[in-house]
Amino acid sequence: MTQIKLSTLQTLLPDATFQNSETLKDINFSGLTSLTLAGPSDISFVASKTFVNEAKASKASLLVVSQETAEALSDKAIIIVSKVELTTAKIIRLFFPEKQPSGKRSAQVAIDPSAKIGSNTDIGHFVTIGKDSIIGNDCIIEDGVKIGDRVQIGDGARIGKNCVFFDDTIVGKRFIAFGNSTFGGDGFGFVYAEGKHNKIPQVGRVVIGDDVEVGSNCTIDRGALTDTTIGNGCKFDNMVHVAHNCKVGDHVIIAGQSGLAGSVTLGNNVIIGGACAISDHLTLVDGTIIAGGSSLRTSPKTKDVYVGWDLGLTFPEFQKYRVNIKNIVNLNKWLKRIENIEKKVGIETKES
């Protein structure tokens, strides 16, 4: 494993404040780990005030902290930063550098002569690349990837094993896809006539922006007539489905096992929790948040946090809904009490 010095951290984090760290200049730090598991050669981090006591007891030699926890840990060797989690991510990358391409190409590939492969791009075993496709510079195409005709993949892409890019799919720079995801398969379009389901040709494309990351086993379908589009900076968890004609804005996050039905439009910075179902032709405005397990059948009217099943309720509305649901179990008891009161005051109870 890579080991790093204090001086490397100081170079990486020029805006950070290093406190009580002078005695650590000769230490070879061997990793970054949790407060409870850290040893004398480790770095750890304090995500919030909740973990201050754990931090005080930790054996880590150096802690990444925020300004709000720095005073409570002033006797420790600390790095004071504005964003603890972001800094932690940068430090982890020091210990675990990303795999870099070297331009190696397996002999067991099938690449059409008309395809263009950029410089310093790795191509693994059993990769196929179709006619007139363009692969950018500094990409890593892992084993078993299937790339159709006229596909474009931008510079710096990382394509996991057995991913499939159907004809005419376009993805931007620094695209990441983990294994077994598919892009540009036919949308689910059929018309029932003459006693059977007749397929509607799906002739649109999938067009994906820059800096998008897609987990394993995701499916993004081509549009029927227009393109399915994914904006810049989007991050999809495993097993996310995007149906035909969807328009996804920039920096959208979708957690695992969630699906967008056809022609859904998501604004920028939308967050969709896990196991959500978004019905067709809905629109979510910029910044909308859908809580995990929700199912939407109507478009939310404003930017808010929505939660529920076929309800489209804001979070405060859902809290009231939950209270009412709990009260239903007492309904028969309350009805009996009302009947008894009516008898006492001489009101005849009428059956409806």
Swiss-Prot record:
Enzyme Commission numbers on file: 2.3.1.191
A GO-annotated cellular component: membrane
Enzyme category, top tier: transferase
Matching SUPFAM superfamilies: Trimeric LpxA-like enzymes
Catalytic activity: a UDP-3-O-[(3R)-3-hydroxyacyl]-alpha-D-glucosamine + a (3R)-hydroxyacyl-[ACP] = a UDP-2-N,3-O-bis[(3R)-3-hydroxyacyl]-alpha-D-glucosamine + holo-[ACP] + H(+)
Disulfide bonds: none
Keywords: Acyltransferase, Lipid A biosynthesis, Lipid biosynthesis, Lipid metabolism, Repeat, Transferase
Transmembrane segments: none
One annotated GO biological process: lipid A biosynthetic process
InterPro entries: Hexapep (IPR001451), LpxD (IPR007691), Trimer_LpxA-like_sf (IPR011004), UDP_GlcNAc_AcTrfase_non-rep (IPR020573)
Domain of life: Bacteria
GO MF, one annotated term: N-acyltransferase activity
NCBIfam families: lipid_A_lpxD, PRK00892.1
Family to which this protein belongs: Belongs to the transferase hexapeptide repeat family. LpxD subfamily.
Function as written in the Swiss-Prot or TrEMBL entry: Catalyzes the N-acylation of UDP-3-O-acylglucosamine using 3-hydroxyacyl-ACP as the acyl donor. Is involved in the biosynthesis of lipid A, a phosphorylated glycolipid that anchors the lipopolysaccharide to the outer membrane of the cell.
Subunit comment: Homotrimer.
Protein's name according to its UniProt entry: UDP-3-O-acylglucosamine N-acyltransferase
Organism: Leptospira biflexa serovar Patoc (strain Patoc 1 / ATCC 23582 / Paris)
